[in-house]
């Protein structure tokens, strides 16, 4: 569902920020 995709995207975004803060 759309909500699920949004949730996964949000989770992935936060994960990337924590794991690779140098990327951005």
From Swiss-Prot:
<dbReference type="GO" id="GO:0005230">
    <property type="term" value="F:extracellular ligand-gated monoatomic ion channel activity"/>
</dbReference>
<keyword id="KW-0770">Synapse</keyword>
<keyword id="KW-0812">Transmembrane</keyword>
<keyword id="KW-0628">Postsynaptic cell membrane</keyword>
<keyword id="KW-1003">Cell membrane</keyword>
<protein>
    <recommendedName>
        <fullName>Acetylcholine receptor subunit alpha</fullName>
    </recommendedName>
</protein>
<keyword id="KW-0675">Receptor</keyword>
<dbReference type="InterPro" id="IPR036734">
    <property type="entry name" value="Neur_chan_lig-bd_sf"/>
</dbReference>
<keyword id="KW-1071">Ligand-gated ion channel</keyword>
<comment type="function">
    <text>Upon acetylcholine binding, the AChR responds by an extensive change in conformation that affects all subunits and leads to opening of an ion-conducting channel across the plasma membrane.</text>
</comment>
<dbReference type="GO" id="GO:0045211">
    <property type="term" value="C:postsynaptic membrane"/>
</dbReference>
<keyword id="KW-0813">Transport</keyword>
<comment type="subunit">
    <text>One of the alpha chains that assemble within the acetylcholine receptor, a pentamer of two alpha chains, a beta, a delta, and a gamma or epsilon chains.</text>
</comment>
<keyword id="KW-0406">Ion transport</keyword>
<keyword id="KW-0472">Membrane</keyword>
<keyword id="KW-0407">Ion channel</keyword>
<comment type="similarity">
    <text>Belongs to the ligand-gated ion channel (TC 1.A.9) family. Acetylcholine receptor (TC 1.A.9.1) subfamily. Alpha-1/CHRNA1 sub-subfamily.</text>
</comment>
